[in-house]
């Protein structure tokens, strides 16, 4: 009889420990972090089709590059979101493959903040910067000259540190 009570007490203790451990994991796992078990978690970061959430309330750290979105410029073909070219005077952006999220951010605004001067601007996502096939690293926000101008930055620099978030 004493063994049965001890066994029951032990079983209850194990269940209590398991429920406490589950309660500590209150946040949703990042499907792109390799440990979250998402559909792309087995792929290296640049090949994932999902989008990691912002890592802080100040936005996701990224590298901003300048791109030509008009026909005949270095941006390549028409934008992935709508199959059209866009004016470099428009506030538009292309995101690395993971952040592009299979097109889920198409035609949505993202807030880009310069880490150099603190200025912010909202740009519309119109394209993907392909980080699966070497076109981009997986931390790129590729923007028009108008975005650089709105942030008070010189396009000749080529790359600047920024943060971005969904607007």
Curated annotation (Swiss-Prot):
Q: Which family does it belong to?
A: Belongs to the kiwellin family.
Q: Read off the InterPro entries from this record.
A: Kiwellin-like (IPR039271), RlpA-like_sf (IPR036908)
Compartments (UniProt record): Secreted
Q: Residue span of the signal peptide, if any?
A: 1-23
Specify the protein name. Answer: Putative ripening-related protein 6
The primary site where this protein sits is: secreted
Disordered: region residues:
28-57
Q: Pfam families, alphabetically?
A: KWL1 (PF24300)
Provide this UniProt record's keywords sorted from A to Z: Secreted, Signal
Instruction: Provide one Gene Ontology cellular component.
Output: extracellular region
Superkingdom of source: Eukaryota
């Amino acid at each position: 009889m004493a063994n049965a009570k001890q066994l029951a007490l032990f079983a209850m203790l194990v269940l209590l420990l398991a429920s406490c451990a589950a309660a500590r994991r209150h946040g949703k796992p990042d499907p792109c972090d390799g440990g979250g078990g998402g559909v792309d978690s087995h792929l290296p970061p640049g090949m994932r089709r999902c989008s990691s959430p912002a890592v802080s309330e100040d936005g996701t750290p990224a590298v901003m590059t300048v791109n030509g979105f008009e026909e005949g410029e270095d941006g390549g073909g028409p934008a992935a979101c709508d199959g059209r070219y866009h004016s470099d005077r428009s506030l538009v952006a292309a995101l690395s493959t993971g952040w592009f999220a299979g097109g889920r951010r198409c035609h949505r605004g993202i807030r880009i903040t310069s880490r150099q001067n603190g200025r912010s601007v909202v740009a519309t996502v119109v394209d993907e910067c392909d980080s699966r096939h070497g076109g981009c690293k997986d931390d790129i926000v590729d923007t028009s000259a108008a975005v650089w101008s709105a942030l008070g930055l010189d396009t000749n620099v080529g790359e600047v540190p920024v943060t971005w978030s969904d607007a």
